Amino acid sequence: MSRFFRRRKYCRFTAEGVEFIDYKDLNTLKNYITETGKIVPSRITGTSARYQRQLATAVKRARYLALLPYCDNH
């Protein structure tokens, strides 16, 4: 038996009843990108496929409008 009990991942957007992920909501988007600027995969965050697609589109739009960086500050 494993020593740890791993908590089941769940989609935060489904639980909160979010209709659409907005690209202007930077606080939410920053939780789903790494410090190097990559989009975190759904197998790590637990986000459902529908919201992962919306999340990727929102991050890409925010990057295009220079609201989020494409990469880290190096």
From Swiss-Prot:
Top-level taxon in the UniProt lineage: Bacteria
Signal peptide start-end: none
GO BP terms, alphabetized: translation
UniProt xrefs under InterPro entries: Ribosomal_bS18, Ribosomal_bS18_CS, Ribosomal_bS18_sf
Keyword annotations: Ribonucleoprotein, Ribosomal protein, RNA-binding, rRNA-binding
GO molecular function: small ribosomal subunit rRNA binding; structural constituent of ribosome
SUPFAM superfamilies linked to this entry: Ribosomal protein S18 (SSF46911)
Pfam families: Ribosomal_S18
GO cellular component terms given for this protein: cytosolic small ribosomal subunit
Task performed by this protein: Binds as a heterodimer with protein bS6 to the central domain of the 16S rRNA, where it helps stabilize the platform of the 30S subunit.
Quaternary structure and interacting proteins, as annotated: Part of the 30S ribosomal subunit. Forms a tight heterodimer with protein bS6.
Family: Belongs to the bacterial ribosomal protein bS18 family.
Protein's name in the database: Small ribosomal subunit protein bS18
